[in-house]
Amino acid sequence: MYINDEDLAKLVAVQVAEMDKKNKVCDAKNDYSRRLDKITNGLNDAEGIKLNFKVYLTKEYNAFACPDGSVRVYSALMDILSDDELLGVIGHEIGHVALRHSKKAWRSALLRSAVSDAIASQSRTWACLSDSQLGDITSLALSAKHSRYHETQADEFGYIFLKRCNKNPWAMGLALTKLKKMLNQKDISKYAKLLEAFSSHPNFDERIEHIKQLAERDNYKAK
């Protein structure tokens, strides 16, 4: 079953809107929103996909980007990362969108779900799906683990992303170092979503070393 980009974007947009309703979204005057606006100022699109940013006020640590261009950052993550480190993480997530990894994850989630036959039998429209079915697809897509190659690509995208924003790209390595430290916490439950997304192979040490090599190659200070 083939799902075109337009239909997929519509599905994702609807599901992101549902997630926005279920989470506490910071309003425009909130300090977190103002900080994110400042950090992402001028970031309008990724490979032609229009971006939109919001902050979820929560004690959980996470950030994700979806194929429709929606980028969501959790306030707790903002508390532990510097502006440049956060921009690197955002760049990594946008990389998955720009490089079409996210689209593959959503398509895979649909095909893995029990509703693919139902969609195919109704001219591949989303109208036949229940809220719970759509929710299952969303959960599968957002929890999908990317391949080693895709994670490396996204890390490199985040690195280049920082360079294009005139930032020291080693901030990507510093962000990964902080995420690695989370694994050593006694209670990692509040980090679960973020670590699930970021701790897939290659491991943190390999990823940090790769970014360090890129930074040293480009004459940026890596410390």
Please provide the spans of the model-predicted regions.
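A Zn2+-metalloprotease active-site environment signal
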Residues: M1-K223
